[in-house]
UniProtKB/Swiss-Prot annotation:
Taxonomic classification: Bacteria, Bacillati, Bacillota, Bacilli, Bacillales
Record's protein name: UPF0397 protein BPUM_3679
Location relative to the cell: Cell membrane
Family label: Belongs to the UPF0397 family.
Organism the protein comes from: Bacillus pumilus (strain SAFR-032)
InterPro entries: ECF_substrate-spec-like, UPF0397
């Protein structure tokens, strides 16, 4: 990385973010009835971190977090690990447009966030994950596309609801620029 390195704050966010992703993925997920496919709250947290720290942090939190989660359960499933990184990366690309650090996360920004996260999740779970499952693991197409569609839809909804609430709550803790005025005596 000639010239541009990650800040200490971002590196710490990646470490903590990956750890929280693992914990949420292991202990706060809901089975769907489709084999190896859960409703994951970890993607709402990944969206928050990607929005706050950008695409590199989002990609690394998703990738490292999913890798550790899989490694501590049934073993790494690389196609889905890669997609978690891709989803974090793509959501992170809008961090500069959303600027939630400035205390504003109104309807226009909520709409932009949800359009991007839904597009990122759809690309990742409806296309990339199933195709990689077929290429890497020779899994049957009908099985992996059903898993991808269920995972994608549940992640879109989870991030759309829980992710939006978390980001909006975070934005409310920030002072809007120009919201403070000097008192005259």
């Amino acid at each position: 990385m000639a010239g541009k390195q990650l800040s200490t704050k971002t590196v710490v966010a990646i470490g903590i973010g990956a750890a929280v992703f693992v914990i949420l993925g292991r202990f706060v997920s809901i089975p769907t009835g489709i084999p190896n496919t859960q409703i994951e709250t970890s993607y709402a947290f990944l969206a928050l971190m990607a929005v706050l720290f950008g695409p590199v942090a989002g990609a690394l939190i998703g990738f490292i977090g999913h890798l550790i989660k899989d490694a501590t359960t049934f073993g790494p499933w690389w196609s889905w690990i890669i997609v978690s990184g891709v989803v974090g990366l793509l959501i992170g690309f809008i961090s500069n447009r959303l600027k939630v650090e400035e205390g504003d996360f109104g309807w226009k920004k909520i709409t932009l966030f949800n359009a991007v996260q839904a597009g990122a999740q759809a690309l990742g779970w409806f296309v990339i994950a199933p195709v990689l499952d077929i290429v890497i693991y020779a899994e049957p197409a009908n099985k992996v596309f059903v898993q991808g569609i269920v995972a994608g839809i549940s992640n879109i909804i989870t991030v759309g609801v829980l992710g939006t609430i978390i980001i909006a709550a975070y934005a409310k803790t920030r002072s809007k620029s120009g919201s403070l005025s000097k008192e005259t005596s």
